[in-house]
Amino acid sequence: MPEYMINGIPVNFPFEPYELQKNYMAKVIECLQNKTNGVLESPTGTGKTLSLLCSSMAWLLHMKSKQPKHRMETIDTLPEPPELSNAKHAALDPEQALALQQQKANAKMKIIYASRTHSQLSQAMQELKNTSYLFVRSIILGSRDQLCIHPDISKQENNAIKTVLCRESVKARNCSFYNRVETAKDRPDVATVPVMDIEDLVTVGRKLKACPYYLSKELVEQADVIFMPYNYLLDPKARKSNGLSLQNTVIILDEAHNVEKMCEEVGSALLRSSDIALAIEDTSSVIKSMMDGGGAWTGDGEKQLELTLDDLVLLKEILLGVEKAVDDIPILFSQGGTTHPGTYIFDLLEKANIKFGNINVVLQVMNSLITHITTEKTGGFVRRGAGLQSMVDFLEVVFASSGPEYRQAVEKCFRVHIEPEEPKQLAKGGVKRADGWTATKQPLKAPVKSTSKVINFWCFNPGFGMRQLVDSGTRSIILTSGTLAPLKPFISELSLPVAVSLENPHIIARSQVYVKVITHGPDRVELNSSFKNRSNPEYIASLGRTALSLCPIIPGGLLIFFPSYPLLNKCSEEWQASGIWGQISRLKQIFVEPRGKDQFTTTMAEYYAQVRDPASRGAIFMAVCRGKVSEGLDFADANGRAVMITGLPFPPMMDARVVLKKQYLDTNRTRENELITGNDWYSLEASRAVNQAIGRVIRHKDDYGAILLCDSRFQNARQQAQLSAWIHSHLRESSAVPNFGTVVGEMSRFFRHMSTASLPARVRDVCAVKDEPAEAAKEEPGKGKRFATAVKGGGINTFAEKFRLSEYLPDSMKVNPHSRSTKSAGDDAEAGGSGLVTLYKRERNDGKGPPPSPGAFEATRKRRKIVIVPQPLVKREDTEDGENVLLPVKQEPDVAAAANVKRVAPENRVDFLREVKCSLSAGSYKTFLQSLAVYNRNSDFVLFIKQLCSCFNKPHLHYLLLAMRRFIKQEHTLEFDTIIEKIEARFFSDM
């Protein structure tokens, strides 16, 4: 891949980067070089993720190249000192153990790449696999729900139950999959695969019969890059559970528009009266068992409970005290609850003798009791300590820190809201709690009383959680997304010191997108989805007629986003009753976003299939802003040619948390902190959700589509200013409000024009995922413009000259680097060349047949198909008709030619490894990579040379064997030269 100098760092990029991509990568590297934090916005479709990965990986390798070689091997690869091998450092003083652990963590600089969902992380890891940095050791952290392969435990539907059963099985050493983890991590299937995503972990776990969940945790220590969801990083409990050290770590938060909310949620907690009652019941049950058993209780386990009867009696008194304190709180149930300052929670819990001085002891007793309760099985009912676990979770958040500064922060940034607890829905055949805990034979003994309450401990300052990351010794924190603007309030809310910021424009031309505000439907009824108007039958009918009128002129897929599920359901019902639904369905089949995970996957597959079907006229997908469809899904090209935003998805105005958030911002806003007002925040919440939904459509530089804002409130200048800058610029050009007929005419002309526009084909549409992009094959290295461009410094530096690829074990390489041309076969014949890439042109409609339907529009615009033909396997011959054609030939290595014409392997390591891949079979190439990995790790030269001779055992491959000298360690070079001399002597004597 071509290389570019950016801020003094050589960056490998799959193609010549656009100016905005260069600017983006320069900002990323600036943050990393200067140990500062950055907030970077780049619209969806501008190659943000690719730019982020390439620049950060290049910087990481640059830093590693500056370290001494013994540091690069890391402490992890060295034998453990004898004093550390005894019972997990039992002989060491706790401070010494902590210091050694910290030293081990600091020995290796890491990058943590976090995003909202595993789907988004998988997309990022796939991007990484398609770059030159696919050899950088990367691992993903996931949940048991995704990674467990135990035949019984994995069948549990609830993740909480799955966690309990897993821990129980691991603790008893009953899980054979867990028991194989230690040996599996050194197997070639794991050790030689640098980038492992969820799918890779599950596949290798099944193959080796080793637990993917615990295997991923083992691989974290060796990894250079760790991918994980936000909550794994932002939640202190999750960080502790996964053993994450943030010292000297670079944190990249992609899709960071969700970070504010996630930080607030991680710092918040709730406790129900029913949770307290369950905790009391569980404690009482164990006390009774201990009294019946003479003061000891073991449940069904072999290990005796490490708590005395006095401990449990004191715990029960504390729990009863909490229950009484909560019951005594006066609230007006008719008003929905009462609110108190954050420090009220400390006063409330102190009534039950829970305070900073004894909180650690209380939590220790509760955790010990939970561990034993989970193993007790009596009468078909599995006690899982749900109430006690809820208590522990709540107390850990409330007492997350201590000292006067913490109390002051809680007073300012937190609120305690107490509201009535609603009765839970009971499942048929038993009692099912909302958190998934299920009783099978007996009813729950903690019914919700009329005075039951919910204690909400809410954090309203996302900077509270962000500061924990900063204070953990991180090197840099980079927040990036396609929808962060306006940046000032975003930065102010996070209380993050930011030295670098960027707002990138969009990569597409202005002619590729049509943006309009539609204030009235075809029947001239105003389109306004405000709370007062959304139940208006005239409005709902007009919205349906708007969609019906636009369907015939929109090719492919149409996305319709609603502000909420109730409005989506209301429109669906009304349109079906009035017949509008049926009229739309005759033009485009309608799909509705489902709530269930399995249903969602199936529905999406059906939608994509309908859009691809040449016989159809496309499809409609009705979804909700902030739903699954609006976050992270790709509706590129025909899958999303237009998006209708039917309203502004404001948060519920009367929701207690929303009201308190607005109050918090208004109260704490000063000139110095630049916080926004409560009303501005409320408006921004809606605009950011709209920006995310719009971003589903324009997904790359050659995409095009229409963005239709179907709500009169979008005509408001203030509302438009909160949209992404590239959308806002289109709206500024046409301030006049067109009538509906004008919009239909303009949009019809727009799609007609785009259907004839010759946009270049996307790389991913014409090449396999693991192939080199077609453009990169057009010119020989060093001769074309693509290889002669640098961002800064003016020079081209070969990637392999800076870094030894062999040390990072490349898993797979790209297609033959000697590919010369993408001309059609006919052109190539005229030129007398033998190009490797043959283009077959599709026939165009000559106008004699019927015009294609809008749904089939995309099928007629498919890119020219590329067929890759390996050059050594074709020859040109004249047929009987006198036509010169390419014919396949069986190629035998010419020994004489090999002897007379001495081939020289490429000096460039990347080119050399590519030539090795092209010259060997798939099996031999895999053996070659594995042997190289083992040699770099174990220095076993005898085994290595034996495997090399096996791979390069043909005379025409001898030059590659000679070139392997560059990978031989210094202490083995003399031995290697001797063996080569013997091989050459035998070879030429046979001649």
From Swiss-Prot:
What the entry lists under SUPFAM superfamilies is as follows:
P-loop containing nucleoside triphosphate hydrolases
**Cellular location of this protein?**
Nucleus
Q: Main subcellular localization, coarse class? A: nucleus
Give the Enzyme Commission number: 5.6.2.-
Ranges for the region named Disordered are 812-833
Entry GO CC: nucleus
Keywords, A to Z, come to:
4Fe-4S, ATP-binding, DNA damage, DNA repair, DNA-binding, Helicase, Hydrolase, Iron, Iron-sulfur, Isomerase, Metal-binding, Nucleotide-binding, Nucleus
Q: Which SMART domains has this protein been placed in?
A: DEXDc2 (SM00488), HELICc2 (SM00491)
Chain location of the short sequence motif DEAH box per the record = 254-257
What one GO molecular function would you report for this record?
Answer: ATP hydrolysis activity
What's a BP term from Gene Ontology annotated to this protein? DNA recombination
Catalytic activity, as annotated: ATP + H2O = ADP + phosphate + H(+)
Record-annotated residues binding [4Fe-4S] cluster?
C148, C166, C175, C211
Q: Name one Pfam family in it.
A: Helicase_C_2
Where, by residue number, does ATP bind?
S42, P43, T44, G45, T46, G47, K48, T49
- Residue ranges occupied by any Helicase ATP-binding domain in the UniProt entry: 7-319
User: What family does the database annotate?
Assistant: Belongs to the helicase family. RAD3/XPD subfamily.
Function noted in UniProt? A probable ATP-dependent DNA helicase implicated in DNA repair and the maintenance of genomic stability. Acts as an anti-recombinase to counteract toxic recombination and limit crossover during meiosis. Regulates meiotic recombination and crossover homeostasis by physically dissociating strand invasion events and thereby promotes noncrossover repair by meiotic synthesis dependent strand annealing (SDSA) as well as disassembly of D loop recombination intermediates.
Q: What is the name of this protein?
A: Regulator of telomere elongation helicase 1 homolog
> Which species expresses this protein natively?
Anopheles gambiae
